[in-house]
A protein has these predicted regions:
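Extracytoplasmic "Venus flytrap"/periplasmic binding protein-like
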Residues: 58-137, 154, 174-175, 293, ...
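Hinge/lid segment of periplasmic solute-binding proteins
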Residues: 27-37, 103-163, 213-220, 235, ...
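Extracytoplasmic/periplasmic substrate-recognition and gating elements
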Residues: 150, 170, 265, 269, ...
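Long, aromatic- and glycine/proline-rich binding clefts that accommodate carbohydrate-like moieties
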Residues: 31, 39, 322-331, 378-437, ...
């Protein structure tokens, strides 16, 4: 009797095991099944090259193996991916089936009709993965970027975000701590307010021969480094890390320019003050140069894109790897307005000229699928999450660099895509130039605010899509 009961139980266990395996296999084969009609198709996808995409490139071949769809995945630098991708999209020729767009590109591309919405593909049960779990996407970036005018454009692929980045070895040095407290009256620590960031910048700006952490400097040292080129993300930093944290903005809710408001003038004053403590070449620094300067140990602190940090703060990435600390973007002391932090969630969209939208849509889903996102984080020994569940992965939760991920999460908790502006590039070009002129002292903050308002009004009275 006991033997018979054991056999029955064993058979039941085997059946349940096979059923579970069959269920798991069915789930794993969704993309293979959905892709069957498109086997042998070749799609071309254009993306940006950062440490994140370099890691992802290792698993893209798995999609080809699973589906039989060939992916020609081209990676270009930040500026090239913008220029080449937009040129193809605006031409309508559809050389690329999908192009990665930064959030600020979406407005101009939408107004040009260069993006194919994915609503019809999402509604197709043969193509839409019912277990994609879009509710798991970090909501601010996803909801502000992937939808427009009642239509879905895609999913969030990259949650680029800025963090506060400083030299922990300097902030924790007892001599520097004592000297800082004697001068400013409070403890030296990672800046939580913009005013503290300014004090730290002033304090650590030293000339060659002066001592830093007890040792004579062989060259000048700077209290801060910021992006300063005309273009790149210079104005984005000023706008959403400074102006908005001062309670200002460049437009009102209806899109009417408000660049000359008093809060913006105050933010510009702080912006100009910080440039005095930066390296003399700041006006030529791009978003790529900022992490390079930090990695070489030339400056004490910065506001930088966290994905570039991943390539610097690691063994072999910098002589100072392991000696950095990170924090949320500092806010204005006593601010009562909502906290702001610069982020650039980015999306892979199907081009209006794509000849293979179905196969491309399957690849887009596969990229953001939880399984692939887990692999991406694991292979990269960290990364920048697009899903909430990624924060709990061991590579992040148990990271040797916990302050970096806490800082990332702080930004992504409030980070959103930029407002949809058809004339974003024209507006950005003007305001980026003004940001540089104010930083260099060629314009006073008041003059900069006045000029910015006038230039915006020349371009648009209502600047939103």
């Amino acid at each position: 009797m006991k033997t018979g009961l054991w056999c029955t139980s064993a058979a039941l266990a085997v059946s349940l095991s096979l059923l579970a395996a069959s269920s798991a296999s069915a789930e794993d084969s969704f993309y293979a099944t959905a892709a069957a009609p498109y086997k042998g198709t070749t799609i071309r996808v254009l993306d940006e090259i950062t440490p994140l995409q370099e890691t992802l490139s290792k698993i893209v071949p798995e999609f080809e193996k699973e589906t039989g769809i060939k992916v020609e995945w081209e990676l270009l630098n930040h500026f090239e991916v913008i220029n080449k991708g937009q040129a193809d999209m605006l031409s309508g020729r559809g050389y690329y089936d999908a192009v990665m767009l930064h959030g600020f590109q979406v407005g101009p591309m939408l107004s040009a009709g260069a993006i194919k919405p994915v609503d019809d593909l999402v509604k197709n049960p043969k193509l839409d993965n019912p277990k994609l779990d879009t509710a798991d996407f970090i909501p601010g970036p996803y909801k502000s970027l992937a939808f427009a005018n009642g239509k879905q454009l895609g999913f969030v692929n990259w949650n680029y975000n800025q963090v506060y980045w400083a030299r922990a070895d300097l902030l924790n040095n007892p001599e520097e701590q004592a000297a800082f407290k004697a001068k400013y009256g409070y403890e030296l620590a990672p800046a939580k307010t913009i005013e503290q960031m300014r004090d730290i910048a002033e304090f650590f700006t030293r000339k060659k021969g002066e001592k830093l952490a007890g040792k004579p400097l062989e060259s000048d040292f700077y209290g801060i480094v910021l992006e300063g080129i005309k273009g790149g993300s210079t104005f984005g930093t000023l706008w959403r890390d400074f102006i908005k944290n001062y309670g200002g903005d460049i437009m009102d809710a209806e899109g009417h320019p408000t660049f000359d408001r008093p809060e913006n003038v105050e933010a510009l004053k702080m912006w100009a003050a910080l440039w005095k403590f930066a390296p003399p070449g700041i006006a030529e620094y791009s978003l790529v140069d900022v992490p390079t300067v930090m990695g070489k140990g030339i400056a004490a602190q910065t506001l930088a894109w966290s994905d570039f940090v991943l390539g610097v703060d690691k063994p072999g990435g910098s002589p100072y790897a392991g000696q950095f600390v990170y924090g949320p973007i500092p806010v204005k002391a006593g601010a009562t307005t909502p906290r702001s932090a610069e982020a650039e969630p980015s999306i892979t969209v199907i081009t209006a000229g794509s000849k293979h939208p179905e196969a491309t849509f399957l690849f887009m889903q596969w990229l953001v699928d939880k399984k692939q996102q887990e692999k991406l984080i694991e292979l990269g020994q960290g990364g920048v999450p697009v899903r909430e569940t990624s924060w709990a992965m061991p590579a992040i939760k148990d990271s040797s660099n916990p302050t970096l991920y806490a800082a990332m999460k702080s930004t992504l908790d409030v980070g959103t895509a930029k407002p949809r502006m058809p004339k974003f590039y024209e507006v950005y070009d003007q305001l980026s130039g003004i940001a540089q002129e104010v930083g260099l002292g060629k314009l006073s903050p008041e003059e900069g605010a006045k000029k910015g308002q006038a230039e915006m009004l020349k371009l648009c009275d209502k600047c939103l899509l």
